[in-house]
């Protein structure tokens, strides 16, 4: 855990606001969504929100260099949000290592791309959202279910949380 996180944005539609954004951060170790944020405007500030959530949840603060000595890499694509000075400065401030996906190589960020495909199929293709508030609630419910109940072949048929907890128990027994 805490070696590589992926992040990306995904657009979806609401009747009231039109196109909106979901930004997510995923843990490559177990596919757990560590942070997510919905917004009408998909700018660098919206893209930073789930990164901050993930850092605060896992390391307890947003202090300067809070993850510097961990060796944690953040892998975004080359979207303008991620290439912006504000985004770059914030991840440097937090101590995250920047590891961008290769240009025109979505498989480089395949973990988050796969999650976005899943949420597209399970949420965005099924629901017609009235507004961003309704979308945020339904997306949040799905992410909660995904983290705790979504069975993934790659994780030996466990959910992301179950895999993390099972791995921590195994590591403690070995130690």
Where are these regions (language model features)?
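Mobile-element integrase/transposase regions
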Residues: 1-26, 32, 48-53, 57-64, ...
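Acidic active-site catalytic centers that drive phospho-/nucleotidyl reactions
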Residues: 8, 27, 77, 109, ...
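Hydrophobic (often cysteine-bearing) scaffold residues that line and stabilize catalytic clefts
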Residues: 22, 43, 47, 75, ...
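A short acidic/small-residue loop/turn micro-motif
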Residues: 27-28, 38-45
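Short small-residue beta-strand/loop micro-motif enriched in glycine and branched aliphatics
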Residues: 32-36, 98-101, 125-126
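Acidic/histidine-rich, metal-coordinating catalytic segments
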Residues: 51, 63-84, 102, 158-161
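RNase H-like polynucleotidyl transferase catalytic core
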Residues: 73-78, 92-111, 128-132
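C-terminal domain-tail junction helix/linker
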Residues: 85, 92-96, 118-175
């Amino acid at each position: 855990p805490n070696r590589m996180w992926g992040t990306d944005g995904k657009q979806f539609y609401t009747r009231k606001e039109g196109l909106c954004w979901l930004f997510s951060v995923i843990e490559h170790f177990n596919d757990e969504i560590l942070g997510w944020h919905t917004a009408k405007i998909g700018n660098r500030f919206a893209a930073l929100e789930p990164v901050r959530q993930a850092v605060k949840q896992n390391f307890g603060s947003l202090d300067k260099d809070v993850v510097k000595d961990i060796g944690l890499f953040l892998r975004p694509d080359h979207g303008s949000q991620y290439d912006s000075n504000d985004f770059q400065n914030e991840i440097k401030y937090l101590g995250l290592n920047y590891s961008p996906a290769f240009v025109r190589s979505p498989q480089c960020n395949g973990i988050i791309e796969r999650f976005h495909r899943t949420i597209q199929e399970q949420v965005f293709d099924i629901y017609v959202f009235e507004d961003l508030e309704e979308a945020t609630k339904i997306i949040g419910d799905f992410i909660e279910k995904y983290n705790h109940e979504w069975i993934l072949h790659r994780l030996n048929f466990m959910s992301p949380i179950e895999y993390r907890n099972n791995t921590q128990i195994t590591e403690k027994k070995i130690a």
